[in-house]
Swiss-Prot record:
It comes from Penicillium brasilianum. The chain crosses the membrane at residues 31-51. In A.calidoustus, the austinoid gene cluster lies on a contiguous DNA region, while clusters from E.nidulans and P.brasilianum are split in their respective genomes. Genetic rearrangements provoked variability among the clusters and E.nidulans produces the least number of austionoid derivatives with the end products austinol and dehydroaustinol, while P.brasilianum can produce until acetoxydehydroaustin, and A.calidoustus produces the highest number of identified derivatives. Its cofactor is heme. PANTHER family: CYTOCHROME P450, CYTOCHROME P450 MONOOXYGENASE AUSG-RELATED. It is an enzyme of class 1 (oxidoreductase). This is Cytochrome P450 monooxygenase ausG. The keyword Membrane applies.
């Protein structure tokens, strides 16, 4: 699970980019006709939007200012370029300066070179929380889940302390459930079958996380899992579509757009499933039931009491799901593709199988056996290095004007990101564009403490860095290793006969495992039972 700032500038579908200015005004006209909105007020709002000048908040160069006579046209063109070409824009910006600005759907943001990562990660006046309000319009019903991003100590402390401490106890549950889920997806066919690594990873990991977060009964409820995975997939696209509209009109548009109405239904339906479970537990405890529950329902409640902070049980669960489902499944899906795309894939998979057998034989799953999966740890970190989750990362909001150590000025109210390019820096990683499976195993043998998958460093910020590094990365690492071990021991994998290397899907800041990619799997006899 990754408690990162997911979805900033995200767009999981391209429908918002295809909307265009013409279709936007057509939709606006339909509002006037269908709902008889006050024309003068609407015309006044549009006039302000069209002729509003771009405010200059910083002297840093602006990379994608766009062209057009009105700010709305410039903004639309900038957002369109941003959504489709962010890697190019970041490279262009870094070729000009170590700090620059990029126009994004939520405004003009500052992007910094990786050399600033440590300073940004530790600065007390740079925090991720307020970013969500701008990007996800958290004041609008349907998007209130994101209001807790970077602001809820209850969630972050529950993950950092309660979840991380339970990893060893949770391992038997995760491995037994993985066996059932994987068999339901890949079956036992002795012949090659084509599957989607992206869909398989999402299916398995969403259900594993649900079991950990809400317990056996609700965690296995297909309605609950469907609601949370659907919200996870659809909320980002809905936010991106909404951000095409000026802020003054967004509450009205959100009230009418089907995608936003659907988000509100998901929240309502999820609450109807969760609250009775919580009430039943409270009632049982009031009657003397001393049963202990090892799930996030209890961790959140206990942490809330210890911190003396309030929280919303449903919204907290939905945010945990967002942090967990997407990032972990993206890493697992990508590493399956990376293994299959290697010319020596059979050799590498064989080495991984030997390591799994050696680590588990005679002892089973425990903290030591997971730690002994050193080659797998390196393979996962190398996959994340070559295809991180995003082009820019470590989103932070400046609560006051900040002067960095080199004199760079960050105006108050600015959103700041770090360009995620250090992981391809040849000065840090020889042959940076080559997948080297044991790259980090070798570094660990030389005493490099940053060479572990869960290590956060300025040279590898796959899980962030500093005070707000992903607190759930230890759970995510264990979860992915367990599932990958089951996959490799029980199945052969390869690319389809006509398959080729598949590039990641670029969508705003996100670099996603290509959802259209396919691999072939067939059942094999595992050497040991796990």
């Amino acid at each position: 699970m990754a408690m990162v700032t997911p979805g900033l500038w995200a767009n999981f579908s391209h429908s918002s980019h295809e909307l265009g200015i013409a279709n936007g005004f057509e939709f606006l006209n339909s509002l006037l006709v269908a709902y008889r909105l006050p024309g003068l007020l609407l015309l006044f709002s549009i006039t302000i939007i069209l002729f509003q000048p771009l405010r200059k908040k910083s002297d840093l160069p602006l990379i994608n200012s766009g062209k057009g006579p009105f700010s709305i046209l410039r903004g639309y063109r900038s957002r369109k370029t941003f959504a489709a070409e962010l890697p190019r824009l970041v490279a262009e910006g870094l070729s000009k300066a170590s700090a620059f600005r990029i126009a994004a759907p939520d405004g003009v943001n500052i992007v910094l070179a990786p050399s600033y990562a440590h300073e940004i990660g530790e600065h007390p006046d740079l925090n991720p929380g307020p970013i969500a309000g701008d990007e996800f319009n958290c004041h609008i019903d349907g998007f209130e889940v994101f209001a807790q991003l970077g602001t809820s100590d209850v969630i972050s402390e529950s993950v950092r302390t309660r979840l991380t401490r339970q990893l060893t106890k949770l391992t038997p549950l995760l491995t037994s459930e993985t066996a059932l889920l994987l068999q339901s997806q890949w079956k036992d066919a002795p012949n090659w079958v084509e599957v989607s690594p992206h869909e398989t990873a999402m299916f398995i990991l969403s259900r594993l996380s649900s079991l950990v977060f809400v317990g056996d009964d609700l965690g296995r409820n297909p309605d609950w899992v469907h609601i949370l995975t659907s919200y996870n997939n659809e909320a980002f696209a809905a936010a991106e579509e909404l951000n095409l509209w000026p802020q003054i009109l967004r509450p009205l548009v959100a009230h009418l757009k089907p995608s936003c109405r659907q988000l509100r239904r998901y929240i309502r339906d999820a609450r109807a499933l969760l609250i009775p479970v919580i009430e039943q537990r409270h009632h049982a405890q009031s009657q003397g039931d001393r049963r202990e529950y090892n799930d996030a329902i209890e961790w959140l409640n206990e942490t809330s009491h210890s911190l003396a902070q309030s929280y919303d049980p449903l919204l907290s669960q939905m945010l945990l799901a967002i942090g967990s489902f997407h990032t972990s499944s993206d890493l697992l899906g990508q590493v399956l593709l990376d293994l299959c795309m290697r010319q020596d894939w059979e050799v590498l998979v064989g080495e991984l199988r030997k390591e799994i057998i050696s680590s588990l034989q005679g002892v089973g799953w425990d903290k030591i056996s997971l730690n002994n999966l050193k080659l797998m740890d390196s393979v996962l970190k190398e996959s994340q290095r070559l295809k991180p989750a995003s082009t820019v990362t470590m989103g932070r909001y400046a609560s006051r004007e900040i002067i960095l150590s080199d004199g760079t000025r960050i105006p108050k109210g600015s959103t700041v990101f770090i360009a995620n390019v250090a992981m391809r820096d040849p000065n840090i990683y020889p042959d940076p564009d080559v997948f080297i499976p044991d790259r980090f195993t070798t570094r660990r043998e030389k005493g490099d403490s940053s060479a572990y998958l869960v290590s956060a460093s300025p040279e590898h910020i796959g899980f962030g860095l500093g005070r707000h590094a992903c607190p759930g990365r230890f759970f995510a690492a264990n979860e992915v290793k367990i599932v990958l071990s089951h996959m490799l021991l029980k199945y052969d994998i390869k690319l389809p006969d006509n398959g080729a290397a598949v590039a990641p899907s670029t969508s705003g800041i996100f670099l996603e495992t290509n959802p259209n990619a396919r691999i072939c799997v067939r059942r094999r006899k595992e050497e040991i039972l796990i």
